Structures are given as structure tokens and as C-alpha cells.
């Protein structure tokens, strides 16, 4: 899918969390209604068959519970996209990437071949449709996520280029597929953020580490031979670090319209003073091929920053389709980040300063990001609110997805007259979300604790927040974490908080719909009343 990703290391985030976020955008001319659900172990398939590639995979018999954001219409498969499992591992899959002819000539995609005559069908490999479902329920750390997906890619191959993010409370990993069977993965530096449009992004890779200690790099076992045999390393000097973007990626004319401008705008917003971003003497321009994969921000990155950049339509530049700078040519020159065919945005935040059972948050938004809101939900629950889960293929304002689609369609043609109402809605619901998280954290923190335990926990949390150093207020092994999350009393509290959030969200969304519908109705061209005379 045509998506946009941002990853934020724990030392770059505002609260010491790891944060992974991605817009899921549908193909041009398509709109995919989405559902936010919990998949219980008994609901997880043991024999999985993909719709697109007709591939059947036998899955392990011990899946973890996890959240997902599948399509409401399953005619093209599940497309689970984003979730957190009960080991507090988050996964976002996938960011569709570009490649080049040299890579595909050396390792072709594994594509489905239909039956023809006496020849039986030949299943294809795995793809975005499948990734979350066949990986997230079976991993207990972010690193394990990379290892499992890498093994599946090597065994079954893939029919498309994809980027996938994994996170736990300690680290974030970014995996990029290479051709049909190869892959690379890099740990996001703790002090940095990563911006990813639909283009292979990693621009420096330590093969020695990937094939050795794997401290910050991993890859398919034969990657060094694959690179050498197929002359993929384009470095002029032997001492130059290996650049996967040059070797495996693309620098096409379409990239300069569709991809590089998005990375340029996100980094321009998060590092406005590091370099010159505009004009003929800019260090990086919207069409630059060397915009860094990772960068240290000038200040800590917040949830609101993430929502802003993933809603971007190039505000403050001549490229804003809703702006007054530039002209009609420049305003439609580049593909915006906040686009009409956005399906959903999931932001997964894993907070090391909270108890294991409630440290994960999955922030959710549906529809076109410039006109929607991002609100928090706790994934460690047995059910999700109907307002976000019960999305149908029928248009109705009774669920969050379609309400947002209707609001966006109304606001797009009257951006200036509706923008104040949208901004007030976003601010109010965002504040409600932060307030609800804080109240729920307090409730969980005091659950069943003695006075002495309360004092000790408060001291630990204050020390963590004050020092902002590596640490965990409740360090546990993965299996201990899973046991802690399977606390029915905690899950009941978190589910109640989620329902409260959904109820308040529905009320505010309906108010916004009423407001923008009134504004658009008053602007109709067939309006007429006697006071006109």
C-alpha cells in the first residue's frame, strides 16, 4: 500500500517511549473501510491461506493475543496492518517500497501463477496481506519479530517490496525486503527518528555486524554473496559504508514527485534549524535523493508531532493544495502525506515507565488525516469498542470510519471555512485522550497495592521520568510479561477506559459532523432567501 511511516527512538520521544506509526493508504481509486479488533488465541488460524497468492502456511499452535486493524471487506484478505501483542511487542506492516531492475533480475518476486490447462496453479509468496497475521502472534521481542519475518521471507519469498517496523519497550527495528527472498533490518538509534515514504530507505548498513554480532543490523544469511555476485554495491571507494538505498532502491523521476517530498517535509518540520530547507541554496530539496534515513530531532518528538507530519499537505510551502502560496501548478506538484485515500493511522507507543499490563497504547485514526483525530486505546483488552470495531462496507455515520470519511469529503471543498472547527475537534479529543490515559494509569497503578507498594512505585516512576535514562519500572522476561498482561481485572479496567474514550469520541465526532454539514449547506450554490433583495 502507498503509506508513510515515522519511527521514534526512546531517547528521541517526549516520554522515553518507543513509538512506531504509519498511515495505511489505499491504492488510487480505492477506499478500504477498517476495523480495530482483538484477535484471541482461539480465533487465530492454524492453517493460514492467503487470498492474493493462494499460499497455505501451517502456523504454530501457541499464538499470543493481539490487536489488528483488518479490512472490513475480506475479499482481498485480512490486511491486519498494525497491532500490539500480549508480550508488548508492536508491529506495523507494511510500507510498500521501490526497488530496481538489477535486484529483481537477481532475485525475482515470487508471484502467484494461475492454473492453465493441465498445469496446476503455483502459489506466490507472502505479502502485506499476510505479514501481521503470520508474525505478530508468535514473537516476544522486536528482535524476534525481525527473525521470524526474515525466516518466512527466505522460506516462502514475497511478491512485493515492503518495509516493516517492530518495537518493544527497549528498541525499534526496521526491516526492508530485497527482491523475492532477501532482507535487511536495522535497529533505529535510540536518539533518532526515521522517516519513510514509499521508497527503500536505509542508507548505511554494517554487513559485518549483520552477519556477526547483530547488535544493530540483521540480514538474510547469503546477503554478502548476493551483493557481490550481482554487483549491487555501487560505492566508489572500498572504505565507503554500504548504502542499501543505492544498491537495492530507486532514484526515479516518480520518486521525486511521490516519495522524496514526504521525507523532506517531515524532517523540515522536526529539524527546522539544522539546515536550509527552502530555496535554490537548500541543503535538501523535495527532490533530493540523499535525505537521511534517520536523524536526531532538535527537540523531543510528541504524539502530536507525529499526527501533524502524518497529516501534512505541505503547510507553509508553495506545495500546499489548500494554501495560498505558489500557484495551481506548485500546489499539485507533490503527493501529500495526508491524502484522500487514507484508511487508518496507527501509532503504537510502548511506555517503560508504566506497569507491563498497561504500558502499551495504540493510538488510532480513520480516514483522511488532515480532517480526523488521533485518540488512544489500550490494546491489552479482550474486546474493542463497537464504534471502531463494527465498521461495515455500508456508509453510515454510526461508526468512526465512515463518520470521518464523510467529514473529510465535506471539509475538503471548504477548507478555510471548516478548518477552525476541525482544529478545535482535534485539540479537544486529543486532550481528552491524554487525560483518560493519565486517569487509567493512576487506576492501574493503585490496583491491589499496599501503601508501601504505592510509595515505592511512585518513587520509581518519578526517578525514571526525572532522569530520562534507560530503565524499566517493571522489568520482566517475555513470559513474565505475558502472564502479567493476562490479568482479567486489569483488562476489564482498560476495556472500560477504551469504551469511555469511544463514547466521548463519538459525541465529539457527531458535533463536528453537524458543524461542517451546516457550513457546507450554507455555502451551497442553490441557496436563496428573501433577505437577498
From Swiss-Prot:
Hydrolyzes a wide range of dipeptides. Highest activity against Ala-Gln. This is Dipeptidase. Optimum temperature is 50 degrees Celsius with Ala-Gln as substrate at pH 8.0. Activity is 30% of maximum at 20 degrees Celsius and 50% of maximum at 70 degrees Celsius. Stable when incubated for 10 minutes at temperatures of up to 70 degrees Celsius. PANTHER family: LD30995P (PTHR12994:SF17), SECERNIN (PTHR12994). NCBIfam families: C69_fam_dipept (NF033678). One of its GO terms (molecular function) is cysteine-type exopeptidase activity. The active site is at residue 3. InterPro entries: C69_dipept_A-like, Peptidase_C69. Keywords: Dipeptidase, Hydrolase, Protease. It comes from Bifidobacterium longum (strain NCC 2705). Optimum pH is 7.0-9.0 with Ala-Gln as substrate at 37 degrees Celsius. Activity is very low below pH 5.5 and at pH 10.0 is about 50% of the maximum. Gene3D superfamilies: Penicillin V Acylase, Chain A. It catalyses: an L-aminoacyl-L-amino acid + H2O = 2 an L-alpha-amino acid. Belongs to the peptidase C69 family. One of its GO terms (biological process) is proteolysis. It is an enzyme of class 3 (hydrolase). Its EC number is 3.4.13.19. It holds the Pfam family Peptidase_C69. Disulfide bonds: none annotated.
